[in-house]
Design a protein with these regions (language model features):
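N-terminal regions immediately upstream of nucleotidyltransferase
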Residues: 6-7, 42
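Short hydrophobic/aromatic beta-strand micro-patches
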Residues: 6, 64-66, 105
Length: 162
């Protein structure tokens, strides 16, 4: 199955964290035939009243590839990698060594307690959409709402002018 992931880091050696996460995806044979976008640096999203020291820039990228795992198995393995690379159970939007989100899983739509595919907030995040446009511009968004059926390229052009 073809998948797309979003990876981000804003704590520690951000570039190394992204590299190690991709290496773990490959070494653990979770994802094959990987194509990775360029790296994008962006400001952290913060909740109102968040501590000032949480305001650390992220580096993000998108990765597409193929997996033999079902979505829940993939999510479990991704959480294992995040823990292996130092991520703790943390407060929402706090700094993290690594954050890996499943954006897309072939043509599946998933809505469970632990997982929503396509990722529910992806369209509102330029740091997800711009890297994704590099690696799968012609993928047609199959989520709900106005942009269902639009390609990633069309969505990025309309929402972000890029």
């Amino acid at each position: 199955m073809k998948i797309a992931l979003s990876l981000g880091s804003n704590k520690g050696d951000r570039n190394k964290n992204l590299f190690l996460a991709i290496r773990e995806l490959l070494d653990r044979k979770l994802v094959s035939n990987i194509v990775c976008s360029t790296l994008f640096e962006n400001k952290a999203l913060l909740l109102p009243g968040a501590p000032v020291d949480w305001d650390m820039d992220y580096i993000n990228c998108a990765v597409v590839g193929e997996t033999h795992l079902n979505p829940e198995e993939l999510l479990k393995n991704i959480k294992d990698i995040e823990g292996f690379l130092g991520r703790k159970s943390i407060v929402k939007w706090s700094p993290r060594e690594i954050d890996i989100d499943i954006l897309y899983y072939d043509t599946l739509q998933v809505q469970s307690e632990s997982l929503v595919i396509p990722h529910v907030e992806m369209l509102e995040r330029n740091f997800v959409m711009l890297p994704l446009k590099e690696v799968m511009p012609q993928w047609k968004y199959n989520g709900k709402g106005k942009y269902c059926g639009y390609t990633i390229e069309e969505i990025v052009r309309e929402k972000y002018g890029a």
